[in-house]
């Protein structure tokens, strides 16, 4: 009887339909969970149509700042977890470009080397902002103008490091960040390292420049370049935050990506291979505007990036902080930042003409081309047991 019932077409259709319904229900729930996991939830609501001036509330900050390295006469209470001076969305303007003298005048509390400590309370985080740089003076001034008041309202102890690549060779963003991390950690035991592109300006001071002890944070989740959304789940570009331990656990960033493209995906793969997970602020908080610019000479598209990405699983323990070499040419304490100039060498592979049409790096056409050429990441194997601690000593 049961056998004949199961053999009827209508019964089989009913069973198959029930299974599909259950699978769809579970899948929808799974996608909702993944959405929350990757930070695509909108989070709190902010009105970006009425931003505040980026220098709002600075006059309300208490007292004179504590000079870097100085000890207060008596123990101070910790600053609140969320500063009362935050204003939410702030206006970001690219014109006119302020002079360095104007920025210094607007930020009298900033100490030499771009250092700041809040007065009246002990900062909960000591954050080093590390900016790779070459031939982007206007972008750098815009970043300094917006970032200093932004960070002061968050009541952080911070320092800004600008890492300048000497010479005219191909630009290497990731290697410059490794240089900046090493030099910054020689100055102070920073709690948090913010790796920050020079052309990205934050639009919401609720986007706190602090690290997540659970794992690396990707902070620039909603750029105007991508329509204020995450371009793909593994994206780790623009602005990211790691504790020194997290940075060393993944052996820092790769040194072999000369030119534009590829290093962000290598870094995201390193996070996974080191047994960590990426966290993100809500989309409504992690807003950034990118300063418009043309393609940079010396930062052309990297034709080797896909070959390098295929090897990341096997190369990440050998290419990074433990293989970093450079010559420190200058380390100067300017009024708004610590300037580090380094000779990081040149691409040993030399130039190679990329296949297909060439678009300006960072353009929408270049991004689409990269998505079409992107190879699927290799499956992660067992984690290596190598010692990931960067050696101390010579460069």
From Swiss-Prot:
Binding site for Mn(2+): 199, 293
Membrane side Cytoplasmic: residue ranges: 1-10
Transmembrane segments: 11-31
GO biological process terms, semicolon-separated: carbohydrate metabolic process; galactosylceramide biosynthetic process; protein glycosylation
Glycosylation sites: 57, 339, 387
List of residues binding N-acetyl-D-glucosamine: 262-265, 305
Membrane topology: Single-pass type II membrane protein
Name used for this protein in its record: Beta-1,4-galactosyltransferase 3
Principal subcellular localisation of the protein: Golgi
UniProtKB keywords: Disulfide bond, Glycoprotein, Glycosyltransferase, Golgi apparatus, Lipid metabolism, Manganese, Membrane, Metal-binding, Signal-anchor, Transferase, Transmembrane, Transmembrane helix
Gene Ontology terms: cellular component: cytosol; Golgi cisterna membrane
EC number: 2.4.1.-, 2.4.1.38, 2.4.1.90, 2.4.1.275
Cysteines engaged in disulfide bonds, as pairs: 79-121, 192-211
Lineage: Eukaryota, Metazoa, Chordata, Craniata, Vertebrata
Task performed by this protein: Responsible for the synthesis of complex-type N-linked oligosaccharides in many glycoproteins as well as the carbohydrate moieties of glycolipids.
Xref: Pfam families: Glyco_transf_7C, Glyco_transf_7N
């Amino acid at each position: 009887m049961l056998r004949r019932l199961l053999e009827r077409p209508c019964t089989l259709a009913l069973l198959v339909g029930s299974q599909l319904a259950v699978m769809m229900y579970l899948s929808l729930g799974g996608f909702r969970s993944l959405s929350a996991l990757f930070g695509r939830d909108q989070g709190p609501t902010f009105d970006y149509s009425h931003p505040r001036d980026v220098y709002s509330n600075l006059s309300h900050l208490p007292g004179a700042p504590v000079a870097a390295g100085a000890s207060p006469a008596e123990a101070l209470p910790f600053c609140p977890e969320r500063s009362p001076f935050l204003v939410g969305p702030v206006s970001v303007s690219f014109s006119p470009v302020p002079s360095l003298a104007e920025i210094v005048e607007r930020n009298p509390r900033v100490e030499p080397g771009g250092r700041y400590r809040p007065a009246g309370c002990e900062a909960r985080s000591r954050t080093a902002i590390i900016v790779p740089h070459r031939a982007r003076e206007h972008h750098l001034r815009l970043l300094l103008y917006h970032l200093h008041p932004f960070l002061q309202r968050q009541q952080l102890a911070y320092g800004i490091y600008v890492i300048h690549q000497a010479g005219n060779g191909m630009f290497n963003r990731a290697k410059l960040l490794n240089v900046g991390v090493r030099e910054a950690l020689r100055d102070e035991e920073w709690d948090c390292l913010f790796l920050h592109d020079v052309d990205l300006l934050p639009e919401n001071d609720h986007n706190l420049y602090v690290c997540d002890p659970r794992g690396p944070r990707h902070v620039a989740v909603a750029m105007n370049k991508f329509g204020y959304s995450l371009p793909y789940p593994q994206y780790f570009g623009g602005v990211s935050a790691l504790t020194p331990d997290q940075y060393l656990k993944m052996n820092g960033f790769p040194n072999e990506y000369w030119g534009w493209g590829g290093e962000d995906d290598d870094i995201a793969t390193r996070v996974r291979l080191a047994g960590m997970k990426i966290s993100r602020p809500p989309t409504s908080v992690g807003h950034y505007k990118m300063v418009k610019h043309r393609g940079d000479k010396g930062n052309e598209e990297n034709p080797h990036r896909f070959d390098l990405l295929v090897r990341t699983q096997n190369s990440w323990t050998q290419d990074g902080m433990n293989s970093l070499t450079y010559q420190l040419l200058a380390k100067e304490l300017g009024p708004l930042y610590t300037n580090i100039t380094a000779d990081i060498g040149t691409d040993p592979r030399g130039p190679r003409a990329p296949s297909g049409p060439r678009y300006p790096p960072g353009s929408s056409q270049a991004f689409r081309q990269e998505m079409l050429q992107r190879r699927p990441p290799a499956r992660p194997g067992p984690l290596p047991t190598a010692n990931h601690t960067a050696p101390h000593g010579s460069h």
